Amino acid sequence: MADSGRPAVEAAMENELRLLDPEVRRCVQELGSLLHPEHIEFGRSGRRRDRAAIIAALTAEDTRAVRPITASRMTAVQLAPDLVHLTFDTDNNGLLAHRSSLWRQTEDGWLLYFHQATPFTAPTVGEGAQDV
């Protein structure tokens, strides 16, 4: 975790991990408290969604029958006093994605302004893990 000692980075990372929590994903109010009013996302599916569409999609998911989403390789950089960029990987029941998030500080705290997910497959044994 890069820059993990900084309060802005810690707040963004903590909030990102909250978004992966099944309880938070089921609650309109909790999701709303973490998403910027102008939030945009390019999801793993390739669809572009705004704040309302993300809240509707996440709260409609049945997360009780599946494993929790796991995050790994999270790194963070504070780009400006009010902007933090996170990158990490997730495993959502075998669906892998590289993720990138921009968190903005507002009067309401650190809110997710932009998010993008890109699907990937885990390299097999003997396959190169380097990307050029």
Give residue spans per PLM region:
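A beta-strand edge to alpha-helix "cap/lid" segment located at domain peripheries
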Residues: A2-S33, I40-V132
